[in-house]
Amino acid sequence: MTKINFRSCLPYAIALIIFILIAYIYASPVLEGKIINQADISSYQGAAKERDDYKKQTGEESFWTNSMFSGMPTTMIGAHYKGNYLETIYNHLFWGPRPASYLILTFVSFFLLLLAMGINVRLSIVGALAFGLCAYNFQILQVGHNSKMVAIALMPMVLSLIHISEPTRL
């Protein structure tokens, strides 16, 4: 049986601690139970109210709403489908309250990309922080473009997996 050299894991543990600390320092109001008032999320809540009320009354999922555009399917405003196993995986990607969890995922994802490309750990930490703390990320978080933030957060991880599987392609 091989022994784990914990000393070699230390830089990566330090990186994760740095990412968590910076995310929660930036988003410290979430530790007090506060949330960002995101305009798109407020609009979504208004659009989904009829669907949510129907589910509370009947216990069934509604796939149509009359409250938007004289009627439309609820697929874009949060219809839930049986057998959607990816939603469970998706929900486990985020540790703690949002937006801190979005930032942590963004930091870790870009950190892994830089490591996969052969960049040393210290520069990978700096690069991950620069990528995660860019102004655009905060703009889209403020207005409620959460799915766009998740796409930005996960893309470096996808690229790192492509690079690992086929190093000559990236």
Feature map (PLM): residue ranges:
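Start-transfer (signal-anchor) and selected internal transmembrane alpha helices
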Residues: 1-27, 163
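Generic alpha-helical structural element
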Residues: 2, 6, 10, 74, ...
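Residue-level signature of transmembrane alpha-helical entry/exit and packing/kink sites
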Residues: 8-16, 103, 124, 148
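Membrane-interface coil-to-helix junctions
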Residues: 22-113, 129-153
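Transmembrane-helix signature of membrane-embedded glycosylation machinery that interfaces
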Residues: 110-119, 159-162
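Membrane-helix interface segments
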Residues: 119-125
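Catalytic or ion-translocation cores adjacent to nucleophile or general acid/base/metal-coordination motifs
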Residues: 154, 158
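Residue-level detector of conserved catalytic or cofactor/ligand-binding positions
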Residues: 160-170
